[in-house]
Amino acid sequence: MRSHWLVLAILFASACSGVPQREEAPRAAVDADWAQVPEGTVWGEVTAVDIDSHGHVFVLQRASRVWQEPFPAEPIAEPVVFMFARDGKLVASWGAGETVMPHGLSVDAEDKVWITDVQREQVLRFAHDGTLEMTLGERGVSGSDQKHFGRPADVAFAGEQVFIADGYGNSRVIVFDREGHYLRQWGREGAGKDGVALPHSIAVEGGRVYVSDRENARIKIYSEAGELLETIATPGYPYAVKPLEQGGFASLEARDAQDRNGAIVRLWRSDGRLERVLDARGPGETKGHDFAIAEDGTSYIADVEGLRVLTFALDPSR
């Protein structure tokens, strides 16, 4: 009897604590074992995922390196880029000795692989096979001019233009052509209409530039010239944003308003109205850092906390 009252007291105290419960949303049927990583592989924090024109899934992970400041200066000795077939079988891996603290990975229309490195303060462009082709920024040097970055986070593309979410230090979008020539930039740190607090993810579709204004808990939509078109508040902190082929866009929240980790996927209509919400957490701790959506609706989440790739079927047309 005493234990019964003790349980009731604990439940009552929890209810009166004022801490809201987690958002109730339908749970996605998540597969946490999709990636067939060979035994003995040094596998660590999974930070980014994207899909090439052949349907290969590129995964960026930090191997033995963890996000801890101050960052080391030595490159990661093991491969950090893994290319999987749609069924999860490993096709190739590369990138050993190239990056120090890799963050974002994006594949362009020519299947070039772009990686941001927040320690190197650079954006690296690789051929599909991992050959380094171009480097933007000065290694290890932060700055806010046309030739330097402030911990760049992500990359997106529109024709010959390359849009970079820059980033943890600069709170701006900076645009180059494909050969690395500076074109323009916009954004400044702040919480007001024109401010940005950590542009963590960027995507471009149909002349609209989608930016996850992470620490302001909102998605900002611009024209390609940098004109602010729309601002959409999100209940949690959006770590990634992706346009949908059917129109509208999807966002991924890795933290809710109470700073609890998770993976909430929201589907938004083109007019900014919320269409659907899914809880895409896997078993155990989950923190969705990035995601990608294949043509058939298969979705891939880079789970930086669970050190894995989560997959589930998403039908944006529902």
Feature annotation, model-predicted:
Residues 4-5, 288:
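Structural motif marking the loop-to-transmembrane transition
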Residues 5-15:
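Bacterial N-terminal signal peptides
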Residues 17-318:
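Eukaryotic scaffold repeat domains enriched in small/polar residues
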